[in-house]
Amino acid sequence: MCAKIVYKSYNQNDNLLFPPSLGELIPENHPVRTVSAIIDRLDISDIESTYKGCGASSFHPRMLLKVIVYSYMSNVYSGRRMERLLHENVNYMWLSGMSRPDFRTINRFRSERLCDGRFEELFRQTVIMMNEEGVVSLKVQYIDGTKIESVANKYTFVWKGSIEKNKAKLEAKVDAVLKAAESVLAEENEECSAEEPSMDDLSARTERILQKMDEQGISNRKLRRSVEKVKDESLPKLVSYKRHLEIMGERNSYSKTDLDATFMRMKEDAMNNGQTKPGYNVQIATENQFITNYGIYWRPTDWGTMIPFLDSFRERYGTQSKEVVADSGYGNEANYAYMESNGIEAYVKYNMFHAETKRRYANNGFLVQNMYYNASEDYYVCPMGQHMERCGKQHSVSDLGYRSEVDVYRAVNCKGCPLRGMCYSSVIDRRSIKVNHRSDSFKKHARELLTSERGMMLRSSRPIEPEAVFGDIKFNHGFRRFRLKSNRKVRIEFGLVALAHNLRKYSAILSKRMMGRNHAYATI
């Protein structure tokens, strides 16, 4: 005989006499409580100052900030999804106090109320809280960068080289047409050539030619059509070329639909053909896997972002960290000089750091780095024992305006040298070498720091600091592409990502502490 099956009580329409509050449905150690507690401690007066009095009441900015930050913690980046969760999710209902702003209100708050440095100030306050809690010390920065795609389409590119080439061709064509017209006018009336407009004002020059042609009754239809084409087509095109170059500024490219995005080569290259995509170079500094600073830059290379990034750290916290750890993408003379002048210990690799440890490199006597150098008399000695005296200096200026000095050394005579084939392959009779002594001294000091006990410890931590943070953000939380346009809004968006990352880690720490206390009470 089968036993009777018993089910637990189930009645959807059974109302409680005293309904539970939403807070009772949320665990004590849930991350949403951490978000609420941290944001309640923030000074949001800068955001409140953007609201105007009178009119309809507004949703509270602290509530909207909590909803957006918690959404980014939960991998929710869309305003429409946030709106839906405010109707469906208990955590969102509790966090918002049952307020239900629509997606337009959420998006407007995110892109307009948090801009102009207001969100950066909130991020600074949270990092200061972490510092007071002992989670970060702000004495060391592990710096790294990654490229994140813009929301713009990859086929919206505008290239500086193409614009400059087409602009020069069109200017030459316009000039030829106008000169041909002016020569005809000069034959009819020599006085008109005396007041020829300058090339700087093509529009006035074209109008003047057409006016003179009407006054003198020039019947050359082909020439007139050419001048009218210059006025109607060529001049507007030159104006558009000028605007493209103004938007581009120092960059080599930009996107038509996100004017601040620059085309860069991304690591995520599905076609494996090196195709460039519009994006931003995102730089972060971490400590104990907490993001302490972030920046958005248009330069694709990391070395050009380091100095402004370190400046932003000092401006944000009023102090500078004593140690900086970074990979070889940041190791150049300008960055080393900046860190030395600001009292920063640079645990920063340079491009040949690992190659110098190889036996093949150390045994190659033809390399400048392995030649004997007499510092007092300023000469090098080649593998055949011949002196290479200094014969001059060369100067170069980087894209950022940093001036470098290189000394040139040249051998006295290399004719008949049995080692010439291995030494150099140039057709000139004597080998010359170029040495940047200042850069070499920076590299020597960097190697001493990196190979010290402290340096070995910091180097071993670097792969699990910013690189692990980027991996967590991109692959665990799916943030591989910005959803807002312009540098101004992209800074807000990545700032939200950074704050969400920090609060996730901080919430995990608090949860472990709470579990530890509960375990201690249970064992008493």
What do the predicted segments below correspond to?
Residues 37-48, 73-76, 88-95:
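Short helix-loop boundary/capping segments at the starts of domains
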Residues 2-33:
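Hydrophobic alpha-helical membrane-insertion signals
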Residues 54, 93-97, 126-128:
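Catalytic micro-motifs at enzyme active sites that drive phosphoryl/nucleotidyl and oxygen chemistry
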Residues 8-12, 56-57, 82, 94-95:
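A short, ordered amphipathic alpha-helix with a cationic face
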Residues 3, 9, 68, 75-88, ...:
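Anion-binding and metal-coordination hotspots
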Residues 24, 56-60, 71, 75, ...:
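Short secondary-structure transition/capping motifs
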Residues 15, 28, 40, 60, ...:
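Generic alpha-helical segment signature
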Residues 27-69:
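Basic, short loop/linker segments at the boundary and entry of helix-turn-helix/winged-helix-like folds
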